[in-house]
Design a protein with these regions (language model features):
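Catalytic "initiation/cleavage/transfer" segments centered on a nucleophilic residue
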Residues: 6, 10, 110-112, 135-181
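Short Gly/Ser/Thr- and Asp/Glu-enriched loop/turn motifs at secondary-structure junctions
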Residues: 95-102, 161-166
Length: 181
């Protein structure tokens, strides 16, 4: 995955096309392009079909997806902060397809709870709650009247709590990888 997102010219072209839709403010076109053109993975494991009870082999990884940041610069800064976080220790962190978000693949202990599905789900919830609590996702946009309230959708994407949730890949030549866990 790291090699694909850091060096694929095809993915670079697809990502640029998807990001242009975002920059033009066309959410409908952005979503369509993302879903129809970008490759994706299911970080939680390999599934026999798209249903959470079809998890024959968990990967030991979960994904935390942070969306709707105010700028690409903010996304780059958060990518580094998440990667350097001593509790999360992501094995991979990269900028999302929109350019205004971050995806982090976070390892967890496969043996903590015997029930694989429950163990994975609890780790997903822990990671999402931790990231939301530790990192400030209040909008810093100057036009926002109440900067303490998050009305922008900015922050952890909670729809990613489903084990079979697809994680769309995007080109990021500055993606961060941890080769030793």
């Amino acid at each position: 995955v790291y090699k694909l997102i850091t060096s694929s010219e095809r993915l670079k072209t697809l990502t640029e096309t998807v990001r242009r839709a975002t920059e033009n403010g066309d959410e409908k076109v952005y979503r369509m392009l993302k879903q129809q053109t970008l490759p994706y993975v299911t970080p939680c494991g390999v599934f026999s079909y798209s249903k959470s009870d079809s998890l024959p082999g968990p990967s030991g990884l979960i994904v935390v997806d942070i969306d709707h940041l105010d700028s690409r610069r903010e996304a780059e800064k958060l990518k580094r902060q998440l990667f350097d976080d001593l509790l999360l220790r992501p094995v991979l962190a990269f900028t999302s397809p929109s350019g205004h978000g971050v995806k982090a693949f976070i390892p967890y202990d496969l043996a903590r709870i015997p029930d694989t599905k429950q163990n994975t789900s609890e780790n997903i919830h822990w990671a999402m709650n931790y990231v939301q609590a530790i990192y400030d996702f209040h909008s810093s946009h100057p036009d926002r009247e109440d900067k303490k309230t998050n009305h922008s959708g900015k922050g952890v994407d909670r729809t990613g709590k489903d084990l079979v949730r697809a994680c769309f890949l995007s080109y990021d030549e500055e993606a961060l990888i941890r080769r030793e866990i």
